[in-house]
């Protein structure tokens, strides 16, 4: 009996430990695979060699389409297959409808009032409704047609006036898209537009990469040491002054119309927001700061996405003369005899649309679509914990040989006869995201890109400066909120189709 009692107690203790382990394992579920993290750093050291999105994609090839990473203090899950992306963005879209908190956004977005980064809830739903039904509806995008045609034409004139000289095409494309968005959002090119654009550039540079404040959120004492907070506060103060002036000018015009008993004609996106605030003031209180936040959202996202995509499309066309020739022949045949292309002329340019799809496949405006798990759930057979940061890896899916034949080859013909689009319905190609938080500006961006590319291909032939061959064109990119070219695209243009000034 003396011998049996210790054995029985030992067995009971062992059994209780097994039960405890089983319960813990059941509660945690099956975690996604991933590389072993280091103390403090996690897996950050594995992203330090080269561009982070290339490093993450390389790890995904090894560990699979649902991969766990430890980024400092953050638990991140990288999604790299259309099937897993569909589970996140469609099957479980409410569970992943949250955007992760970003320190820079906290400072710049007027207390998370932007459409892009505001928390999932009543405010976000209301602003999303305004965006889809009012700000960026198809009717509204069509109403901006004359603005697009004017500003694309200004780009064509600039290139023509500098025929035979080196043109910084990247710079001119970004100026064009900024002008389009400025006129659509503010009603005209604002006096401080150059300063405003320069401030946006600063935000993109500061926000590029992984910020210490985001990777180690509990170590708040580190924030002053990086210099990020004072830099962002300085930029925000300057931007707020410009936006405040714009909103005030619009309010003055509205008051003048009311005083004179004249009908106020809505002109731009700021007018639309102010009209909504006035019409719904008893149901939904839209503050001036929220108007500024949404305006900043539209300006930054609308300009940056269109310009980055156009820049990469022109780069790929130059790098692939066969594709350039085919695209030029299509637009020149369709618009033969015309000195100026209008938006209605490009509706049937099917190959141009394939070029844009192929550009989005290889060069999504941003390499990752971020989400946050609102609750614990299962993706691809793995348990995703609540609060985990989700990175949908557009870069990996666009270059996956199991999805695309010869994925590194720029071949628009791969989409011929295909129903695949980039509007969130086909998860192998989601440059604008998907689900409830899909970018509401798809139509606006697409219209800018189509007209800009069509005009540039119609009127000009191009070569690289300084006798460089097309094979020498540098296709390296930067990492940031959007992935621009590392070096500006510089070309020498020759007029092929004359135009009338």
From Swiss-Prot:
GO molecular function terms attached to this record:
heme binding; iron ion binding; monooxygenase activity; oxidoreductase activity, acting on paired donors, with incorporation or reduction of molecular oxygen
Q: Which cofactor is recorded for it?
A: heme
**GO cellular component labels:** membrane
Q: Does the keyword Oxidoreductase apply?
A: yes
Q: Which Pfam families match?
A: p450 (PF00067)
Q: Principal localization?
A: membrane
InterPro entries in the record: Cyt_P450 (IPR001128), Cyt_P450_CS (IPR017972), Cyt_P450_E_grp-I (IPR002401), Cyt_P450_sf (IPR036396)
Q: Which residues bind heme?
A: 439
Instruction: Report the top EC class in one word.
Output: oxidoreductase
Instruction: Report which reactions are catalysed by this protein.
Output: dihydroniloticin + 2 reduced [NADPH--hemoprotein reductase] + 2 O2 = melianol + 2 oxidized [NADPH--hemoprotein reductase] + 3 H2O + 2 H(+)
Record EC number:
1.14.14.-
Compartments, record wording: Membrane
Q: Locate the transmembrane regions by residue number.
A: 1-21
Alphabetized, the UniProt keywords read: Heme, Iron, Membrane, Metal-binding, Monooxygenase, Oxidoreductase, Transmembrane, Transmembrane helix
Signal peptide span per the entry? none
Q: How does it sit in the membrane?
A: Single-pass membrane protein
Q: What does this protein do?
A: Monooxygenase involved in the biosynthesis of limonoids triterpene natural products such as azadirachtin, an antifeedant widely used as bioinsecticide, and possessing many medicinal applications including anti-tumoral, anti-malarial, anti-rheumatic, antibacterial, anti-inflammatory, anti-pyretic and diuretic effects. Catalyzes the conversion of dihydroniloticin to the protolimonoid melianol.
Question: What's the protein name?
Answer: Melianol synthase CYP71BQ5
């Amino acid at each position: 009996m003396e011998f049996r009692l210790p054995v029985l107690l030992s067995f009971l203790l062992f059994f209780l430990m097994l039960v405890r382990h089983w319960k813990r394992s059941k509660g945690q579920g099956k975690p996604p695979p991933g590389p072993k993290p280091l103390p403090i750093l996690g897996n950050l050291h594995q992203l330090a060699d080269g561009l982070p999105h290339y490093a993450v994609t390389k790890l995904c090839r090894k560990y699979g389409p649902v991969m766990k990473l430890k980024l400092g203090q953050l638990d991140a899950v990288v999604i790299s297959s259309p099937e897993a992306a569909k589970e996140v963005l469609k099957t479980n879209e409410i569970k992943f409808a949250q955007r992760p908190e970003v320190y820079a956004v906290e400072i710049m977005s007027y207390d998370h009032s932007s459409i892009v980064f505001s928390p999932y809830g009543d405010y976000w739903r209301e602003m999303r409704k305004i965006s889809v039904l009012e700000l960026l509806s198809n009717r509204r995008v069509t109403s901006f047609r004359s603005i697009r045609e004017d500003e694309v034409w200004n780009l064509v004139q600039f290139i023509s006036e500098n025929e035979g000289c080196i043109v910084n095409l990247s710079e001119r494309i970004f100026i064009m898209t900024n002008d389009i968005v400025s006129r659509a959002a503010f009603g005209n090119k604002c006096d401080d537009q150059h300063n405003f654009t320069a401030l946006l550039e600063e935000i993109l540079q500061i926000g590029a990469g992984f910020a210490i404040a985001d990777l180690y959120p509990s170590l708040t004492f580190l924030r002053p040491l990086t210099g990020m907070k004072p830099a962002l506060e300085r930029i925000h103060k300057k931007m707020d002054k410009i936006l405040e002036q714009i909103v005030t000018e619009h309010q003055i015009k509205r008051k003048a119309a009311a005083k004179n008993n004249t009908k106020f004609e809505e002109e731009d996106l700021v007018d639309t927001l102010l009209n909504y605030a006035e019409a719904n003031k008893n149901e939904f209180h839209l503050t001036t700061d929220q108007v500024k936040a949404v305006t900043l959202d539209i300006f930054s996202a609308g300009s940056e996405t269109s310009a980055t995509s156009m820049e990469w499309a022109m780069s790929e066309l130059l790098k692939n003369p066969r594709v350039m020739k085919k695209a030029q022949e299509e637009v020149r045949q369709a618009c033969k005899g015309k000195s100026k292309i209008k938006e209605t002329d490009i509706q049937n340019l099917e190959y141009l649309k394939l070029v844009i799809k192929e550009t989005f496949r290889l060069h999504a405006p941003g390499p990752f679509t971020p989400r946050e798990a609102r609750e614990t759930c299962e993706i691809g057979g793995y348990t995703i914990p609540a609060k985990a940061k989700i990175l949908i890896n557009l870069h990996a899916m666009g270059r996956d040989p199991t999805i695309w034949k010869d994925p590194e080859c720029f071949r628009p013909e791969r989409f011929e006869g295909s129903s695949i689009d980039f509007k969130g319905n086909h998860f192998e190609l989601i440059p604008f995201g998907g689900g409830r938080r899909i970018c509401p500006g798809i139509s606006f961006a697409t219209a800018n890109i189509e007209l800009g590319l069509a005009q540039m291909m119609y009127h000009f032939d191009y070569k690289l400066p300084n006798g460089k061959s097309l094979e020498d064109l540098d296709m390296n990119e930067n990492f940031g909120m959007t992935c621009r070219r590392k070096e500006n695209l510089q070309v020498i243009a020759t007029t092929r189709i004359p135009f009338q000034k």
